[in-house]
Amino acid sequence: MKSFVPLGMALAALCAGGAAHAQVDPLQVRSWAAGCTSCHGTNGRAQPGMPALAGTSKEETLKKLLEFKAGKRPATIMHQLSKGYSDEQLSAIAAWFAAQKP
C-alpha cells in the first residue's frame, strides 16, 4: 500500500497539469484572431462585401472553420489558413469572435 501513495500523487499531478494546459491564454487567442483582420476587419467588423465575424454564433463560426479545414467548404484562402490551427484553437478563435460586439 505504501508504494501506491507516490504513484497516486504522481497521477494526480499529471491530471492537474493536463487541466491547466487545456486553458488557452486570452491574449494568445486575440493574437490568432488578429490574423483575420485583413479580410474580416478589426475585431471582426468587416467592410461591405466580406463576412463580419463579430457577434456571430461560436457554433456556426466553428462549423464553418472546420469545414474549411476539411476542404468541405469552397474558399479562396480559408481552407489553407484554417489548416494552420488545431480544432481547439479554431474553437477558441470562434469563441473570441462570438464575444465581440457587432
What role is predicted for each listed range?
Residues A13-A33, P51, L62, E67, ...:
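Electrostatic cytochrome c docking/interface patches
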Residues K83-P102:
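C-terminal capping alpha-helices of c-type cytochrome domains
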